[in-house]
Amino acid sequence: MGTSSGSNLPHQMLPPRQQLQTSLSLVSSDPHLSRSNSGIVRESPAESASSQETWPTSKSIMGRKTDSGKTGPDSHDQHVIRHVSIADKVSLRDIARERLDIVAERMHRLPEEYLEELKNGLKAILEGNGAQPIDEFMFLQKFVQTRSDLTSKTLVRAHRVQLEVLVVINTGIQAFLHPNINLSQSSLIEIFVYKRCRNIACQNELPADGCPCEICANRKGFCNLCMCVICNKFDFAVNTCRWIGCDVCSHWTHTDCAIRDGEISMGVSPKSVSGMGEMLFKCRACNHTSELLGWVKDVFQHCAPNWDRESLMKELDFVSRIFRGSEDTRGRKLFWKCEELMEKIKGGLAEATAAKLILMFFQEIELDSPKSLESGEGGGTIAPQDACNRIAEVVKETLRKMEIVGEEKTRMYKKARMGLEECEREVEEKAKQVAELQMERQKKKQQIEEVERIVRLKQAEAEMFQLKANEAKVEAERLERIVKAKKEKTEEEYASNYLKLRLSEAEAEKEYLFEKIKEQESGGNGGEASQAVMYSKIREMLHGYNASSPRVDPRSNQRNPFRSNP
C-alpha cells in the first residue's frame, strides 16, 4: 500500500494520492503551477456516482420530468437563431449521427452565439433542466459510442465545438464545456479515444505510467493514478482514508468499494514473522495483499493535525468500518478506540485533542506489538544489562505517557471545572430569571383578579339596571293600560254628553217646528194646498224622528238641517 508502515521508501510515506490535483482550478496553461494537492479533504462520492464526473443526478432527472412546462436554453436568444438558415442549422443529434466532415463544414458557417446555445443545450440536458429528457442524452451517447468512424485521424478535421460536444457525450462530463477549461484539440481527441485520462485534474496519458496490468490494458479510459479499480470513478479526495493504495502496484481503490466487495478481510500478511492474522486489503489489480493498520497509522500521523471536526469524524468512521470485522487484538482495540473517540467528539471533545489521543493510541499498540517474538526468533538470550536498559526505556516511556495522559486529564478537569462554574452561573442567572418571571406572573395574576373583580361588579350593575328596566317596563305597561282605560271612559262620557246635547237640540228644534206649525195652522186656514202638503210631510218626519230616536255622530260638527231651514 502506498503508505503502509515500514514497507516502502520514504517518498512513499506521504499521504495517499498526494500527487493528484484537487480542483479544476489547478488545470492551467501555466507550466510553473504546482501539481501538488491543496490538502483539502473533499467528500468522496464513491458510494453512488462520482459527482466530479457530472453525471445527471436522479433528483435533477425527476425535477425535469415534473417540470415539463419549462423551456430549455434552446428557446433563449431567438433573435440569434432566426438569422441561421434551416439548411445550416446543426442539432446535437446531427453531431452524434451525421458524418464528421459534413457537420464540421456546416458548423464553420454558424455564428458563435449559435454554437454557444448548442453547448448550453447539452449542459441543460446533463443537469436535467433542459427541454429534452435525460433519455435524450443516453440516446446521443449510444449513437456516439457505436460509431466506428470517430478515430484519432478523423477527429482532427472536427470543429472545436463539435469535438467538445462529442467528448462530453462520450464521457458524460460537462466540465469540458466550461469556458475556463481550454484543452488542446489533441488532448480532447486523446480523451475521446481513451488515450488520456478524462479527469481534468489528472490528464495523464493512458495507460498511466505504462502499467501493463490487465485492468489498465483492457479497461477503456481507466487511470490507475486517480480512479478506483472497482467502480472506475474518480474524485478529488486526498489526505484521507477514503482511498486505499496497493503496496505492490500502486493502484487505488475506494474504501467503500473495497468493503462492499469484500476486498478487506482477515488474513496473514506475507511480511508477518509471527504468523498472526490481521486486517488485510486485497488489490483487485494484482491480487496482492497489504496490511491496513500501519497504513491507517501513517495517514493519521501525516494528516490528522490538519483535519477539522467533520473530517476527523468521517475518517474515524472509515477506520471503524474497516476494522469492524477484525479478530486480532490490535484491530479490535483500534475499532473500539475509534468508536470511543466518535462518541467523545459528539459530546464536545476538541478535534485536536482527539487527534492527539488517536496518535498516542497508535504508539501504545506499536509497543504492544509482538516485536520481542519477531526479534528473538532464532536468537540467543538477552544480556541482563540489555534487559535492564530495555526495561528502563519501557518504564521511561510509560512514565512519559502517564505524564502526558495526566496533563491531558488535568486540562480536561480544568476545562470541566470551568464548564461546571459556567453552568452554575447560568443556573443562578436562570434562577433569577425564574424569580423575575414568578414575580411578573404574580403581578399579572393580581391584575387579572382585579380585572375579574371589575367585570363581576359591572355584571352586577348590569343585572341591577336590567332589573330596574324590567320593573320600569312593567310600570309603563300598567300606566299604559290605565291611560287606555281612562281614554276609553272619557270617550264614552264625551259621546254620551254629545248625544245628550244633540238630543236636547233636536228636542228644541222639534218644539220650535211644532210651534211654527201650530201658528201656521191657526193663522192661515185658507192656505194653499201645497203648503199644507209640505206641513204634513214635516209633521210626519218629526213623528218619525221621535219614534226612531236617531243616533248622531258626536264627533261630527254638522248641524241638523232643520236649523238652517226654519
From Swiss-Prot:
SMART domains: PHD. Expressed in roots, seedlings, stems, leaves, flowers and siliques, especially in the vasculature. It holds the Pfam family PHD_Oberon. Induction: By auxin in the root elongation zone. The keyword Ribosomal protein does not apply. Keywords: Coiled coil, Developmental protein, Host-virus interaction, Metal-binding, Nucleus, Transcription, Transcription regulation, Zinc, Zinc-finger. GO terms for biological process: embryo development ending in seed dormancy; maintenance of root meristem identity; maintenance of shoot apical meristem identity; primary root development; regulation of defense response; regulation of gene expression; root meristem specification; transport of virus in host, cell to cell. A zinc finger (PHD-type) spans 225-289. Residues 1-79, 545-566 are annotated as: Disordered. Residues 1-10, 47-60, 555-566 have a biased composition (Polar residues). Residues 407-522 form a coiled coil. Disruption phenotype: No visible phenotype. When associated with OBE2 disruption, plants exhibit premature termination of the shoot meristem and impaired root apical meristem establishment, leading to a diminutive phenotype characterized by an absence of roots and defective development of the vasculature. GO terms for molecular function: identical protein binding; protein heterodimerization activity; protein homodimerization activity; zinc ion binding. One of its GO terms (cellular component) is plastid. Probable transcription factor that acts together with OBE2 for the maintenance and/or establishment of both the shoot and root meristems, probably by controlling the expression of the meristem genes such as WUS, PLT1 and PLT2 and of genes required for auxin responses. Promotes cell meristematic activity via the WUSCHEL-CLAVATA pathway. Involved in the development of the basal pole and in auxin-mediated root and vascular development in the embryo. Confers sensitivity to turnip mosaic virus (TuMV) probably by promoting viral movement and multiplication via interaction with TuMV VPg. This is Protein OBERON 1.
